Curated annotation (Swiss-Prot):
This is 2,3-diketo-L-gulonate reductase. The keyword Protease does not apply. It is found in: Cytoplasm. NCBIfam families: PRK13260.1. NAD(+) binds at residues 168-174, 224-225, 304-306. The active site is at residue 44. Its EC number is 1.1.1.130. It is an enzyme of class 1 (oxidoreductase). One of its GO terms (molecular function) is 3-dehydro-L-gulonate 2-dehydrogenase activity. The lineage of its organism: Bacteria, Pseudomonadati, Pseudomonadota, Gammaproteobacteria, Enterobacterales. Belongs to the LDH2/MDH2 oxidoreductase family. DlgD subfamily. Homodimer.
């Protein structure tokens, strides 16, 4: 089915208000969920909203909490989210990293005791729109087996890198081949994954999203490489924030909350003039996209460039929402 941005935001806002969230916070949170969905990231927008409400009702998320600065070391700051709303707090932390970068050339904010930030790419994009390189990542509950294991002991720990090119170039990737949100999107659409994404009941690689969801044996991106990246990203976030690791979140908490996150902004214009920056970025993009195609019908893609097209299509034609997901939200 199709809905407008206004319908989507109103539905989110209604549910948040009914759960006791104050009107200003509810409006800002509903706006972010709707913007994420409108941009085409359904897995961490509309599809994720019922799960967000579940955690709100369980007390994992404290809607009136505000992040608190703990330590300031010039370009580096350490903050405590105090289990506040994840997407609103993440936006504030990237804004703070940008402010630090404006003064120092680079800004780093390490956040502990945080909640799920929903679409991580929103915060990299936020920096790139203002002309900064944006880098951020988060740890999570253990939802992926380390390479060579059967048990989940590492997080998908998504990493975002956004570059202020025209259009914005951005990688937004979990350390698994597919996030659990994308497994859900493909399952709801009745699609197999384009490549293997995890293991079946017999321990064989499979493209069936429902089987992978059931078994909780998701495949690390690049096999041992994604597994290793997940571990070191967790270590850095834990140390810089003085926060909880994947092990602590998984073993000590009843659900995924109290996680650790990193937000970095770099002011490129302190290092290179604007025309030179733009020319260098354009040459990279032209060089990549002018390569001979393996399939004449398949264009060579640059990461993140599809979001400009998806956003325009959703604004023109309405936002696609799965019927079953919409029914869940209407019933909340």
């Amino acid at each position: 089915m199709k809905v407008t941005f206004e319908q989507l935001k109103a539905a989110f806002n209604r549910v948040l208000i009914s759960r006791g969230v104050d009107s200003e916070t509810a409006d800002a949170c509903a706006e972010m969920f709707a913007r994420t969905t409108e941009s085409g990231v359904y897995s961490h927008g509309v599809n994720r909203f019922p799960r967000f409400i579940q955690q709100l009702e369980n007390g994992d998320i404290i809607p009136d909490a505000q992040p608190k600065r703990i330590t300031s070391l010039g370009a580096i700051e350490q903050w405590d989210a105090q289990r506040s709303i994840g997407n609103l707090t993440a936006k504030k932390m990237m804004d703070r990293a940008i402010e630090l970068a404006a003064d120092h050339g680079i800004g780093l904010v390490a956040l502990r005791n945080a909640n799920h930030w929903m679409r991580g790419g929103s915060y990299g994009w936020q920096a790139a729109e203002k002309g900064y390189i944006g880098i951020c990542w988060t740890n999570s509950i253990a939802v992926m087996p380390p390479w060579g294991a059967k048990e989940c002991r590492i997080g998908t720990n998504p990493l975002i890198v956004a570059i202020p090119s025209t259009p914005i170039t951005m990688v937004d990737m979990s350390m698994s081949m597919f996030s659990y949100g994308m497994l859900e999107v493909n399952r709801l659409a009745g699609r197999q994954l384009p490549v293997d994404g995890g293991f079946d009941d017999e321990g064989n690689l499979t493209k069936e999203p429902g089987v992978i969801e059931k078994n909780r044996r998701i495949l690390p991106m690049g096999y041992w490489k994604g597994s290793g990246m997940s571990i070191v990203l967790d270590m850095i976030a834990t140390l810089l924030s003085d926060g909880a690791s994947v092990a602590e979140v998984t073993e000590d908490n009843s659900d995924e909350y109290g996680i650790s996150q990193i937000f970095i902004a770099i002011e490129v214009d302190k290092l290179i003039d604007g025309p030179t920056r733009d020319a260098k970025l354009q040459r990279i993009m032209d060089y990549v996209t002018s390569a001979e195609r393996a399939d004449e019908n398949q264009a060579i893609r640059l990461p993140g460039h599809e979001f400009t097209t998806l956003l325009a299509e959703n604004r023109r034609n309405g936002i696609t929402v799965d019927d079953s997901v919409w029914a869940k939200i209407q019933a909340l």
